[in-house]
Amino acid sequence: MAPNAAPALAGVLETALYVDDMERARAFYEGVLGLEPMFGDARLTAYPVGGRGALLIFRRGAANHTAHLPGGTIPPHDGSGPIHCAFSIAADALPTWEAHLAALGVAVEGRTEWRSSSGAARSVSIYFRDPDGHLLEFATPGLWPRLDFDQHGAKT
């Protein structure tokens, strides 16, 4: 490693979204996306996603003060306005997800077909919103080719 070079990061462990109504958010993330909470209370619900990370749903304003825990402290954080979060899905699952969202009245606001510099099809993304206006994305493999892994975490 070069002098003053940063050590390697192992991945993104958590992504946080901030919501106004925790019950409404849980109904969406559990009922529409099928996520199962690993922890939940009035302040925070945490969902495992893909076996490699967690989606944290905080009630807006609930984390804007220092949290004092037995093992230390967590600095304040919060977010306002629509935030973007993308989920990876299998290419053959895209039509099923589109039908599932439509059946539940969740509007797909956009669709992008990603292409390589040569024009070859690479990936497809669809975009929709949660009840708090956060922009969510389902992306098929190939959007970020260096990041494609199978369901077991093996590089494809």
Label each PLM-derived region with a short phrase:
Residues 1-23, 84-85, 89, 142-156:
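N-terminal beta-strand motif that seeds the catalytic metal site of vicinal oxygen chelate
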Residues 18-64:
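Core segments of cupin and vicinal oxygen chelate
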Residues 20-23, 80, 84-132:
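Vicinal oxygen chelate
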Residues 43-44, 114-116, 142, 147:
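Conserved beta-strand edge residues that scaffold enzyme active sites
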Residues 54, 135-138:
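Short glycine-/small-residue motifs
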Residues 60, 65-90:
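Helix-adjacent hinge/juxtasegments
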Residues 121, 138-145:
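Short beta->alpha transition motifs characteristic of CBS
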